Amino acid sequence: QQGWQNLQKEIFDSAYSEESYDSAVEVTEYEGEPYVILDGNEPAFTEDEMTTTVYEQYSPLDSYGRCQTAEACVGEELMPDEKRGDISSVKPTGWQSVRYENVEGGSLYNRCHLIAYQLSGENANEENLITGTRYMNTEGMLPFENLVAEYVHETDNHVMYRVTPIFENENLVASGVPVSYTHLPAHETRGNLVC
């Protein structure tokens, strides 16, 4: 088995929830798990949206300055080959830089890329960074970002990837981040979940 297959097996064998929600809006509150499966884990892409042409697209910020949908067709040619730069110049909505000794890594909040730097090479793009808890970032989103990156590196295939943060009312911090991805053309790796 390839590395990406091992990652996928590890993620879904230890799936935190056997329950699958029909949509992200059904997931009303944190249930003690870093992510839950949506729509039977079927990716939310139409046939017309599927492409192997690499691109990335970031929606404009809303009237509160909050990120909206970010989408990409991830391939080797989009992925960076240098380390991520400094992103401290971006202050996403709800940002608070507070350190706690009892929080792993020290920070309760992280600047979270909607489309991970390792997938897109996007650094300090304000349309791609939200305020999220370190837990959501490292336990919820990162395993899937690593899976997609590993898959692309090992197979040289492309992956459709879409992330849309959910903001309740006027809240400046996202209450969840639905992530949908699928490999082209055979859908060997795919997911539809909310972190």
Region roles according to the model:
Residues 155-181:
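A motif-centric signal for short, conserved binding hotspots located
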Residues 2-45:
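N-terminal, intrinsically disordered, polar/charged segments of Gram-positive cell-envelope systems
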Residues 182-189:
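Conserved small/polar residues in nucleotide/adenosyl-binding loops
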Residues 141:
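Sequence context surrounding c-type heme c attachment/ligation sites in exported
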